[in-house]
Amino acid sequence: MIYVHWLFLVVYSIIIIITMVRVLMDNRQPAKTMAWMLVLMFIPFLGIILYIFFGQNTRKERKIWQQSLDQLTKRSMLEFVEQKDFNIPEEYRTISNLFMNQNLALPFKNNEVEIYTSGYDFFPSLLMEIGKAEHHIHIDTFIISDDPLGRIIADALIDKAKQGVEVRLIYDDVGSWRTPNSFFMRMRNEGIEVYAFMPVRFPAFTSRVNYRNHRKICVIDGEVGFIGGMNIARRYVQGTPKQSWRDTHVKLTGAAVYGLQRAFLVDWYFVSKVFITERSYYPEIIIGQNNSLVQVVTSSPTSLWPEIEQGYVRILTNAKHYVYMETPYFLPTDPILFAMRVAALSGVDVRLMIPYETDTKVVEWASRSYVIEASKAGVKILLYRKGFNHSKLLVSDDAMATIGSTNVDFRSFENDFEANAFFYDKKIALQVKEIFLADQKDSIDLDDVRRFIKKPFLQRLWESFVRLLSPLL
């Protein structure tokens, strides 16, 4: 028995060493590498299991993803080139070029933009546009629930499929894990093409569970699109039994829908291995009344660059007057936290709004030390108290804004597939600013919250320990 015991320890030690070498060779951010090292060293056995399920890299998918991205960019690139008299204003040129150089995200002019700040406004508009569809409906969502709202959306899609409209739905297999398969089978049986994104089935489970499609995109007839923070579930309208829900979503009409279409079709190729590039999915541009300049930007763990994260850093470092941000989860990467500190210490009015109470306690504990650190540099921290604020937005200098699915955390910037719309338009920026200032009225300043400022030693120690694991949360 003694020999068996020692043999087991030797084998386990070899596995740990091999795994740690693999973590090092991945060449990730030092914080993430160190977090996995700590897990492997100080959580025996369970640490190995956690790494197998959540720690493996996505390099294998990168090549196929890049090929699909290149192919599906060609159509929207043609439309981009055809834009007449198109000249990006100087103040937006550097960030627009950043996104174009990273993954060929293209800016488009002549867009009409409508912003929704609650599910009560967004979902009736979505259903209305679904009802108008004549050619196709494309939906990409993290969560679609088998609840009253989910069934209403499903019924609307089934009705359009029966009318001959092409309906395609992508849902995230982890985000929608509570939704029974019968819900999706009913749609499939009625002619809707439905795919789960990266299904978590053995043996693929271990390599895929950590990389999720967090995007919330809808494209209708290639003319109207939606993007933002709301999934398809009742709580995005009514909230939860504990608290109400605050969120932000956007309706786009105009050429920027090409960007949404490209994002969906890249995901569609990934799940179905079917290329869709026909002209009918990129119809003639409908000129929006607002004439807004919009750039739809995606990011993913398969990308060479963290596109949206680098965009946020660029905005923070370029800001001259203010940057206002809303996020439900604040576990910033080093570049984001550094940029926030530098901006605030340079005299820029940097404000960060997070929920007073999150829906995940571990994330709340981990975020507190980041919040205090940002606050010490002069970032004004606001805690939203009128329910749970799930909104993901940023506005800067009355000049530009972004709304989408991206949280200010490691998961969104590094592990998840995300999508944001960037608006280079003073009118839209002022709208987003007004939304932020309205939310600020329902918030309290961090300095007024005793539990954040004066904490016992053991609590501070615990929060600092959990912070070490923030790259994994």
Regions found by a protein language model. Give the residues of each.
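A short glycine-/small-residue-rich loop at the edge of a beta-strand within enzyme catalytic domains
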Residues: 303, 307, 327, 331, ...
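Helical hairpin unit composed of two closely spaced alpha helices linked by a short loop
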Residues: 319, 329-351, 355-356, 360
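Short, solvent-exposed amphipathic alpha-helical segments in soluble enzyme
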Residues: 185, 339-343, 369
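A beta-strand-loop signature enriched in Asp, Gly, Thr, and Trp
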Residues: 346, 351-396
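N-terminal localization/anchoring segments of enzymes in phospholipid and broader phosphate metabolism
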Residues: 1-310, 314, 318, 358, ...
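Thr-Gly-centered strand-to-loop micro-motif
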Residues: 325-327, 384, 403-404
